């Protein structure tokens, strides 16, 4: 353990009200740089949440009940946390559960991606560049969550996506840079194959030919 974190874990080991300790953020994911802090979460059996900074350590105190019922926007952080201490075994269970997506969640991500792809291409066709670019960018948010979810894990926050998007990553980066509708069509065709292979053809078919139609659009 880092010298900044070790004393926190050692103190937690001897505190009967502490269920465990988590490390969150870039330090837990091997993505730290010289500006990265140490985000340490001390999980209590009982008590009030708190947060304080001590140099490069952000010390967060929460309860086991709150970890079990974490809000949806915090799930990526919990899913990619590192368990430093787990007296009851419940933290490991919570981290694992946070990383799982249901079929319903994955289907919704795919549908959201298709929706923004469809609307972006229609906007390009009508000469509405700003809307087309914004929709293209948002489509990639859904897509990243989908691709990592199909591989069995909840996506981390977007700043940690590099190197996690598989063979499609170069094309995704190109679409992120340009919002080029032709590149969007190329990407969607590849995504369609992946999603179909994972059993989500029903989502595509639910568009009743609308995606097929915008795939025939030609852009100069």
Segments (PLM) and residue ranges:
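Short aromatic-enriched loop/helix-cap "lid" or pocket-rim segments at secondary-structure transitions
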Residues: 33-35, 71, 159-161
């Amino acid at each position: 353990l880092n010298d900044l974190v070790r004393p926190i874990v050692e103190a937690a080991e001897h505190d009967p009200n502490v269920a465990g300790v988590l490390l969150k953020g870039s330090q837990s994911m091997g993505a730290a740089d010289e500006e990265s802090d140490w985000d340490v979460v001390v999980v209590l059996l009982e008590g009030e949440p708190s947060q304080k900074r001590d140099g490069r350590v952000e010390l967060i105190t929460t309860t086991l009940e709150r970890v079990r019922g974490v809000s949806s926007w915090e799930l990526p952080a919990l899913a990619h946390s590192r368990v430093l201490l787990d007296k009851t075994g419940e933290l490991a269970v919570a981290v694992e559960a946070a990383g799982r997506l249901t079929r319903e969640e994955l289907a919704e991500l795919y549908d959201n991606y298709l929706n923004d792809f469809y609307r972006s291409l229609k906007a390009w066709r009508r000469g509405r560049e700003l809307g087309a670019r914004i929709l293209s960018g948002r489509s990639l948010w859904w897509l990243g969550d989908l691709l990592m979810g199909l591989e069995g894990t909840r996506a981390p926050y977007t700043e940690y996506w590099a190197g996690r998007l598989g063979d499609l990553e170069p094309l995704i980066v190109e679409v992120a840079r340009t919002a080029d509708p032709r590149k969007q069509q190329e990407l969607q065709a590849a995504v369609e194959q992946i999603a179909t292979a994972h059993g989500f053809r029903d989502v595509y078919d639910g568009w009743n030919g609308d995606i097929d139609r915008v795939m025939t659009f030609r852009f100069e």
